[in-house]
Design a protein with these regions (language model features):
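Short, solvent-exposed coil/turn segments at beta-strand boundaries
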Residues: 67-76, 94-99, 148, 200-208, ...
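An acidic-aromatic
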Residues: 66-125, 221-225, 351-357, 364
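N-terminal mature ectodomain segment of secretory-pathway/periplasmic proteins
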Residues: 22-23, 31-105, 157, 180, ...
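Flexible, processing/modification-adjacent segments and terminal tails
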Residues: 96-189
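Short, solvent-exposed recognition patches
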Residues: 62, 120-124, 128-130, 258-357
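Gly/Pro-enriched, hydrophobic low-complexity segments
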Residues: 146-248
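N-terminal leader/targeting segments and the immediate start of mature chains
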Residues: 2-64, 68-73, 142-144, 251-269, ...
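Short, hydrophobic/aromatic-rich segments at coil-to-beta transitions
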Residues: 44-49, 72-77, 147-154, 182, ...
Length: 385
């Protein structure tokens, strides 16, 4: 569970080293987004102080937090100052691939959330791809943010105003915010518009500030501003920021099913799994990352999930799951034939092949549509028959 990407030997990597000290030539908005996507795809770790302000006509909320991230999922956030009663100063959130801890100092309660089989996704990458593909964008201006030379990009949704729903959800940093487009059930906005300004550090092209403004005609309905201060990339933060021990005496609550175990080797997992584990042939560059054994009672049974990832691209994943209780509906899926297997296909955000062998069911899945799922399924076959 310690896969790390290798920085590509490209111009972006040179930029990360800080070789640019003056504003570069004005780039196009397309170039800004492409450079930013390359940066967030190769950066190893990020540390910053994050200042967030949310303003509406009758109130203003501020949060200041220290953030350490190791993309795509590891993150530590410590709230330094906050006027938001729901997230007070002293609140802590620590997330890894398999677990999230959230500590509330007001109640002295720590919540441990288990998610050992969650697909990895880099929020910054998804946000940048959304800006590139779902917004009309243009270069706005040069600027200075926290003493850094920066380029600002202006973006507006590329769909008609009639398509705007009751609310628009924005991914800002590591948090999803809903900005209402109706003041109340009986008071819809008459002429809503949304405008986003995103600032990119000139030296690294990392996004360091964002402002999202919702207007009704000329009136500002809400404005959200986020700024990264004292930004540092690739400092080698190590494991310590992503480990967490609740304060002594605090109340601990658990959400989600705690796994029987998370194992590095097949032999260790085989000792606790109640059935024979498959031995799939996984193509390179995939390497096994972890094996998760979960027990979910008589109704859902025991599942064992073998996770594989690309060491140079942590978001590129593939997993094989075996279960003693069937969780797919053949009548709702498209059937196919692979060698001697009757498989059922599911398309969508995750591409999946399901099949049944005697008392066990198997699944091969990946969020990437071009992965060799059929070859992996064929290599597993029906080991339980």
């Amino acid at each position: 569970m310690k896969r790390r990407r290798v920085l590509a030997a490209t111009g972006s990597a040179a930029a990360l080293a800080g070789c640019l000290s003056v504003p570069s030539q004005q780039p196009s908005s397309d170039r800004l987004l492409e450079d930013a996507l390359e940066t967030v795809s190769t950066v190893e770790d990020v540390s910053a102080r994050r200042a967030l302000t949310v303003e509406v006509p009758d109130s203003r909320t501020e949060r200041v937090a220290d953030v350490t991230k190791r993309p795509p999922t590891d993150r530590r956030l410590e709230m330094v100052d906050s006027s938001d009663l729901s997230v007070p100063a002293g609140a802590v959130s620590v997330r890894t691939t398999t677990t999230t801890w959230e500590y509330d100092p007001e109640t002295d309660t720590a919540i441990e959330r288990h998610h050992p089989n969650r697909i990895l996704a880099d929020v910054n990458r998804l946000t940048l791809e959304s800006l590139r593909e779902e917004y009309d964008h243009s270069y706005s201006r040069t600027d200075t943010v926290d003493g850094r030379d920066a380029h600002a990009l202006l973006a507006k949704p590329d769909h008609d105003e009639d398509e705007l729903t009751r609310s628009i959800e924005f991914l800002v940093g590591e948090t999803a915010y809903q900005i209402p487009l109706e003041r109340s059930d009986d008071d819809a906005l008459e002429d809503p518009t949304v405008e986003r300004l995103v600032w990119f550090d000139d030296a690294t092209r990392y996004p360091i500030k964002e402002r999202t403004t919702v207007r009704d005609g000329e009136a500002v309905v809400s404005e959200l501003t986020l700024t990264y201060e004292d930004l540092s990339l690739d400092d080698g933060v190590g494991e310590e920021p992503f480990t967490y021990e609740p304060p002594a005496g605090s109340t601990i609550e658990t959400v989600g099913t705690e796994p029987v175990g998370i194992y590095d080797s097949r032999a260790e997992a085989a000792e606790v799994a109640p059935y024979e584990l498959p031995e799939p042939e996984i193509p390179g560059p995939f390497e096994r990352d972890r094996i998760v054994v979960l027990e979910k009672g008589d109704e859902l049974g025991t599942s064992t999930t073998l996770w594989y990832g690309d060491p140079d691209d942590p978001e590129r994943e593939l997993f094989v799951a075996v279960r003693d209780e069937q969780r797919f509906d053949p009548d709702a899926l498209e059937g196919d034939r692979i060698d001697d297997l009757d498989v059922y296909c599911r398309d969508g955000r995750i591409q999946t092949l399901f099949w049944r062998c005697a008392e066990l069911t198997y699944e091969v899945s990946s969020p990437y549509s071009d992965e060799p799922l059929e070859e992996v399924a064929s290599s597993i076959g029906c080991p339980s028959v």
